């Protein structure tokens, strides 16, 4: 037995080594984190376009434009921060429509002082109300960029930059590298700058086109995994066929007794509510949410409201629990297998998303109607938005059983919301054939016994 045990240990050792080597190979051959990916928006990205418009004695003047090609993810306040590393010893002489966060060490310049001398500058947008002589088209929105789906007129942000100590021809210019984008926090990964065909610009009447002297693009993609954000929304559920209201999971976005952030919530009926809202955090943008079991700034409630012969109705309510923030141009994305049969929608805009191809239409984007409910007010009596959906039943798939009527996934403003566990969903009342069988059998037995007794009576 001892010999057999030793032999088995010797035979296992090579297998273990092989397993370790295989695991290491898989680890090092895995895709790099630069391949950011969002399952509901696989082709979404932020494209940064540099158009060199003119050459200067020691460099060039370029217009930099950021396009938000994401389906549903805005760049929200406090806005984007764009960074890069210069390839040589370039400096920024001046900027229009944006500014760097630091000037850096410009002590070697005896004459005019550059706007920024840092090797790795960080650029931010200017605020609304900036003087006209410091503006350029599509600038000065505090770094906020909406999506093309929802607001195409505000889906880009631009600034002009004058670069010195740089190349002065297409062949001598060295492209910046190591691009970073915070919008406003982490989550975006940017690729290398790639030279593309020069951008063309058309006159107002469309009869003449000019073009940039040189153009390069940088593509940045988003990943929830890289962002590692604390959840900011949660989902609760209810239905007409079950009295159970499934609340957001406890501590979905935090816990009330979290000692690391004291004073981060206030009770709805607290006499100190207004003083808490006007406290020091008001000017820093620090959230102040209503004290709840879930502690989320946003709750989405999905209520299965009515059942008709050929249709069924759902009510969606979005509630803001943040006393210090309202949400402009908010949007909601949800997944449900019956979204391909949406018949009517009340008080929300709607667009189907097809992340898996045109044959699968189970993802929908909703947003508010302009001047009606596109602004989700801060917590309080007006801090909610509601809509109802009328959906046609699909005879092949439709059922109220096993939580089918509830969404698989919900996003608010691009953030994945915390869902209740599936076993907590409101289910149909227990009426399966198995539960009726004992009652039916007992009645049958009683009938047979009664018939037998009557026969011998």
Curated annotation (Swiss-Prot):
Domain of life: Eukaryota
Pfam family of the protein (one): COB_C
Span of the signal peptide: 1-35
Residue stretches spanning the membrane: 437-457
GO biological process terms on file: cellulose microfibril organization; plant-type cell wall cellulose biosynthetic process
Cell compartments where the protein resides: Cell membrane
A cellular component term, taken from the record's GO annotations: plasma membrane
Alphabetical UniProt keywords: Cell membrane, Glycoprotein, GPI-anchor, Lipoprotein, Membrane, Signal, Transmembrane, Transmembrane helix
S-S bonds: none
Propeptide cleavage-removed residue intervals: 431-457
Residues where lipid is bound covalently (GPI-anchor amidated asparagine): 430
Positions bearing carbohydrate: 45, 170, 178, 217, 242, 258, 326, 341, 361
Recorded topology in the membrane: Lipid-anchor; GPI-anchor
Xref: PANTHER family: COBRA-LIKE PROTEIN 4, PROTEIN COBRA
Record family assignment: Belongs to the COBRA family.
Function: Involved in determining the orientation of cell expansion, probably by playing an important role in cellulose deposition. May act by recruiting cellulose synthesizing complexes to discrete positions on the cell surface.
The name this protein goes by in its record: COBRA-like protein 3
Protein species of origin: Oryza sativa subsp. japonica (Rice)
Higher taxonomy: Eukaryota, Viridiplantae, Streptophyta, Embryophyta, Tracheophyta
């Amino acid at each position: 037995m001892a010999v057999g045990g030793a032999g088995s240990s010797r035979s296992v050792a090579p297998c273990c080594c092989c397993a370790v080597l295989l695991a290491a190979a898989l680890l090092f051959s895995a895709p790099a984190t630069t391949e950011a990916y969002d399952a509901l928006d696989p082709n979404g990205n932020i494209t940064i376009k540099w158009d060199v418009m003119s050459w200067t004695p020691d460099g060039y003047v370029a217009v930099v434009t950021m396009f938000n090609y994401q389906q549903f993810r805005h760049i929200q306040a406090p806005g984007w921060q764009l960074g890069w590393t210069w390839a040589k010893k370039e400096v920024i002489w001046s900027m229009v429509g944006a500014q760097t966060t630091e000037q850096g060490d410009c002590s070697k310049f005896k004459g005019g002082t550059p706007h920024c001398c840092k090797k790795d500058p960080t650029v931010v947008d200017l605020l609304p109300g900036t003087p006209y002589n410091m503006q350029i088209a599509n600038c000065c929105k505090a770094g906020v960029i909406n999506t093309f789906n929802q607001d195409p007129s505000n889906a880009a942000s631009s600034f002009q930059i004058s670069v010195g100590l740089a190349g002065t021809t297409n062949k001598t210019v060295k492209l910046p590298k190591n691009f970073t984008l915070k919008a406003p926090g982490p989550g975006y990964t940017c690729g290398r700058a790639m030279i593309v065909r020069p951008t063309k610009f058309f006159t107002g009447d469309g009869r003449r086109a000019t073009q940039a002297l040189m153009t390069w693009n940088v593509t940045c993609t988003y990943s929830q995994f890289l962002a590692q954000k604390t959840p900011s929304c949660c989902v609760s559920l209810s239905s007409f066929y079950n009295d159970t209201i499934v609340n957001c999971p406890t501590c979905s976005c935090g816990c009330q007794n979290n000692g690391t952030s004291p004073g981060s919530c206030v009770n709805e009926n607290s006499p100190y509510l207004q003083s808490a809202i006007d406290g020091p955090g008001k000017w820093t943008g620090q959230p102040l949410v209503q004290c709840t079991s879930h502690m989320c700034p946003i709750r989405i409630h999905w209520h299965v409201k009515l059942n008709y012969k050929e249709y069924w109705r759902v009510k969606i309510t979005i509630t803001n629990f943040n006393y210090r923030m309202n949400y402009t141009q908010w949007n909601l994305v949800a997944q449900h297998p019956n979204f391909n049969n949406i018949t009517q929608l009340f008080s929300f805009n709607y667009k189907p998303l097809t992340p898996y191809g045109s044959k699968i239409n189970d993802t929908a984007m909703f947003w508010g109607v302009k001047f009606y409910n596109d602004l989700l007010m801060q917590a309080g009596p007006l801090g909610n938005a509601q809509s109802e959906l009328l959906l046609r039943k699909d005879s092949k798939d439709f059922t109220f059983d096993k939580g089918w009527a509830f969404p698989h996934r919900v996003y608010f403003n691009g953030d994945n919301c915390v869902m209740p566990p599936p076993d907590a969903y409101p289910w149909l009342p227990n009426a399966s054939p198995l539960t009726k069988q004992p009652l039916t059998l007992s009645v049958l037995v009683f009938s047979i016994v009664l018939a037998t007794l009557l026969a011998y009576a």
